């Protein structure tokens, strides 16, 4: 972060307090003594000073203005207001007389009654400023890599199994539980793509483990069973995934598992609370299908609990 403090000539103590705070946070900052007269005549300064000032303005990420009363809409003021507004930079205003013309307050940022009030706000919100700065840095990195910061782009890298790039999306502020444009959660995409490391990572960072896709209404665990992937199914079960979910077509998870007939997966679900008597729209349960299609290994598994 690069903070800029515009300060009036009579605001030395306030400026020192602000500088001390930024220094305590190990944040880069610079100070420009600038009252109304400075803003009115700065554009007439020599070429080198003007270049230095404009370079300073362009590298600024946050700005504090103290003692900025009676500023006329000079070329410099209009430039600063337009630049900071266009870049959506946080600007904090502390008028020396406690009152700032509306044209300035509305154009630039948030007004505080005095420096102590501003410092109180900064102390409270500084972790968020740091978080936002990190996100902006990651967004810039993704841009330079030619990677769009969109849910569909995120899902593409999830499906590829690219953990490093996927982590950048989350660091840039993307929600781990977000869905792509088709309505498929990232955890389901990772599962359907058989990307165990991505599934593990998404669970770890708090992705909604029971989120269902728009297409089939499958959760990640249902996708793991459908893909016949025991390792991912086991991971999801251990993470607390719901074992008795029902798909859009009315199929309970245990019915899907019985259809796949992977004894290892069926045993995993059954022993962790899978309901073998939960029926689909045909009125059939996992137990019923096992008997109908004479899947003896499943019949034995399901009957074992009765003994």
Task: State where each predicted segment sits.
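Conserved N-terminal substructure of TIR/SEFIR domains
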Residues: 1-60
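Conserved TIR/SEFIR loop-to-helix hotspot centered on a Trp-containing motif
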Residues: 69-86
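C-terminal interaction surface of TIR/SEFIR-family domains
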Residues: 100-167
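Ankyrin repeat boundary/linker residues
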Residues: 147, 180, 213-214, 247, ...
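Start-of-repeat signature of ankyrin repeats
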Residues: 150, 183, 216-217, 250, ...
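Ankyrin repeat A-helix N-terminal signature
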Residues: 156-161, 189-195, 223-229, 256-262, ...
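Ankyrin repeat structural motif
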Residues: 162-170, 195-203, 229-237, 262-270, ...
């Amino acid at each position: 972060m690069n903070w800029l403090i515009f300060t009036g000539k009579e605001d030395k103590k306030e400026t020192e307090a602000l500088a001390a705070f930024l220094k305590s946070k190990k944040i880069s900052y610079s100070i420009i003594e600038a009252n109304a007269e400075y803003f009115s005549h700065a554009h007439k300064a020599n070429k080198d000073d003007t270049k230095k000032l404009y370079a300073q303005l362009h590298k600024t990420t946050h700005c504090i203005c103290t003692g900025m009363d009676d500023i006329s809409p000079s070329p410099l003021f209009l430039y600063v207001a337009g630049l900071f507004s266009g870049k959506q930079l946080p600007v904090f205003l502390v008028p020396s007389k406690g009152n700032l013309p509306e044209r300035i307050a509305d154009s630039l940022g948030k007004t505080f009654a005095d420096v102590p009030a501003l410092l109180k706000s900064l102390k409270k919100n500084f972790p968020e400023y740091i978080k936002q700065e990190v996100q902006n840095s990651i967004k810039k990195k993704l841009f330079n890599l030619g990677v769009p910061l969109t849910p569909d782009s995120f899902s593409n890298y999830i499906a590829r199994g690219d953990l490093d790039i996927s982590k950048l999306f989350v660091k840039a502020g993307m929600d781990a539980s977000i869905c792509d444009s088709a309505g498929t959660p990232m955890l389901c995409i990772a599962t359907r793509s058989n990307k165990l490391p991505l599934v593990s990572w998404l669970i770890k960072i708090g992705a909604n483990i029971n989120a269902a896709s728009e297409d089939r209404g499958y959760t990640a665990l249902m996708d793991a069973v459908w893909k016949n992937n025991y390792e991912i199914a086991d991971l999801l079960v251990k993470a607390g995934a719901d074992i008795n979910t029902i798909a859009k077509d009315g199929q309970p998870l245990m019915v899907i598992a019985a259809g796949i007939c992977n004894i290892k997966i069926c045993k995993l679900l059954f022993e962790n609370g899978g309901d073998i008597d939960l029926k689909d729209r045909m009125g059939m349960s996992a137990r019923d299908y096992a008997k109908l299609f004479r899947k003896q290994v499943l019949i034995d598994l399901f009957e074992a609990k009765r003994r």
